[in-house]
Amino acid sequence: ENLLPFKVYPLNFVSNEHQLVNIYNAVDIFVTPSLEENLPNTIMEAMACGIPCVGFNVGGIPEMIDHLHNGYVAQYKSSEDFANGIYWTLTEPDYPSLSEQACRKAISHYSENVVAKKYIDLYNKVTGRNA
């Protein structure tokens, strides 16, 4: 039984990249209520589609979501603050800026080229090579 005040569309496992992008682009925000995360791919995927995100201040989430710039970082285990984050994100007058900042963050920090360069720099540092 759905106790939420809006329709819920359950999704099965999605492996098709185009279908996944369409799903992200059909939503206004992405929320992750997880209390244990490192670097969630789902946040990166949503941000790459320009979707502001809401998550708890745990693991790598606060490194990914810039509080009040591309989403909302709620106090750890505070369901009230988490709900406030969802409300704030949905009602933010400058939602287009949130969306743009989410996309920019994904590209500037998590794109394949950026991540590959970070790995190369790390390997060069560890091996004492200069590239």
Predicted regions mapped to residue ranges:
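Aromatic "clamp/platform" in nucleotide-sugar-dependent glycosyltransferases that forms part
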Residues: L35
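Short alpha-helical donor nucleotide-sugar binding micro-motif in glycosyltransferases
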Residues: N22-V27
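Conserved acidic donor-binding segment of nucleotide-sugar-dependent glycosyltransferases
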Residues: H67-L68, Y72-S79, W88-P93
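Short hydrophobic beta-strand element within catalytic cores of glycosyltransferases
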Residues: P52-G55
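Nucleotide-activated donor-binding/catalytic signature segment of Leloir-type glycosyltransferases, i.e.
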Residues: E1-V14
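Short acidic/histidine- and often glycine-rich active-site loop of Leloir-type glycosyltransferases
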Residues: M44, V58-V73
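A short, well-ordered alpha-helix in the C-terminal region of glycosyltransferases
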Residues: D81, D94-H109, K118-D121
